[in-house]
Amino acid sequence: MPGLTIGDTVPNLELDSTHGKIRIHDYVGDGYAIIFSHPADFTPVCTTEMAAMAGYAKEFEKRGVKLLGISCDDVESHRQWTKDVEAYGGKQQQQQATTTKVTFPILADPARDAIRQLNMVDPDEKDAAGRSMPSRALHVVGPDKAVKLSFLYPATTGRNMDEVLRAVDSLLTAAKHGGKVATPANWKPGECAVIAPGVSDEEARKMFPQGFETADLPSKKGYLRFTKV
């Protein structure tokens, strides 16, 4: 379905949240932010997801990435539900002797207008009143307020926060090097990145004094070049 996608500017909506009124562009500020929706409060998969996101919040904070949740429940519902989220997350963290706290705001969109503008509507899910429900959507928004990456999951599939964090690390790595590098399949921080096709070998030698390795492939085109970044 058409809607907000990579490269589009996220709409500058103002909504009530668990932290008061929030205007999205002001919240994103000069850094990165993750805006993620969940179908409904007090539901099983959403509770595990929100607890997982809360558990990863410090990792995102280390990277200068803010978190912003949203669903169609009201603010009071969010506040009551986060007690369950924190209790569940705390039980999962007992072995690490840590606690789970939802420190980031959750937006309330009972009118469903924001989830439509953010392209977060699940076409297959309705509530008891027949109203639209959010999908498990996630947008990573950059300092320019444009969408850099999107995930879209159905209600039946919880998101993997390790993959969200890995994808954010990939975006930040590419941005740090001006788009001159990209990350290959299954990449993890600390592993080699690949040099963008538009970078000549001569330019690559200047940009990456640590050197690079070109994969020996049948085509002999020399396009697959790995370097430590």
From Swiss-Prot:
* GO MF annotations, alphabetized: peroxidase activity; thioredoxin-dependent peroxiredoxin activity
Give the enzyme class: oxidoreductase
Example of a GO cellular component annotation carried by this entry: nucleus
Active-site residues per Swiss-Prot or TrEMBL entry: C46
* InterPro entries xrefs: AhpC/TSA (IPR000866), Peroxiredoxin_AhpC-typ (IPR024706), Peroxiredoxin_C (IPR019479), PRX_1cys (IPR045020), Thioredoxin-like_sf (IPR036249), Thioredoxin_domain (IPR013766)
Q: Does the keyword Transport apply?
A: no
**Which PROSITE patterns does UniProt cross-reference here?**
THIOREDOXIN_2
Q: What is its EC number?
A: 1.11.1.24
CDD domains membership: PRX_1cys
Which parts of the sequence form the motif Bipartite nuclear localization signal? 205-228
Reactions catalysed: a hydroperoxide + [thioredoxin]-dithiol = an alcohol + [thioredoxin]-disulfide + H2O
SUPFAM superfamilies cross-referenced by the UniProt entry: Thioredoxin-like
Where is this protein found? Nucleus; Cytoplasm
Domain called Thioredoxin: residue spans? 4-173
Q: Name one GO biological process term.
A: defense response to fungus
Q: What residue ranges carry the coiled-coil annotation? A: none
Q: Provide the alphabetized UniProt keywords.
A: Antioxidant, Cytoplasm, Nucleus, Oxidoreductase, Peroxidase, Redox-active center
Something else the entry says is: The active site is a conserved redox-active cysteine residue, the peroxidatic cysteine (C(P)), which makes the nucleophilic attack on the peroxide substrate. The peroxide oxidizes the C(P)-SH to cysteine sulfenic acid (C(P)-SOH), which then reacts with another cysteine residue, the resolving cysteine (C(R)), to form a disulfide bridge. The disulfide is subsequently reduced by an appropriate electron donor to complete the catalytic cycle. In this 1-Cys peroxiredoxin, no C(R) is present and C(P) instead forms a disulfide with a cysteine from another protein or with a small thiol molecule.
* Function in brief: Thiol-specific peroxidase that catalyzes the reduction of hydrogen peroxide and organic hydroperoxides to water and alcohols, respectively. Seems to contribute to the inhibition of germination during stress.
Q: Its family?
A: Belongs to the peroxiredoxin family. Prx6 subfamily.
Designated name of the protein: 1-Cys peroxiredoxin PER1
User: What organism is listed for this UniProt entry?
Assistant: Zea mays (Maize)
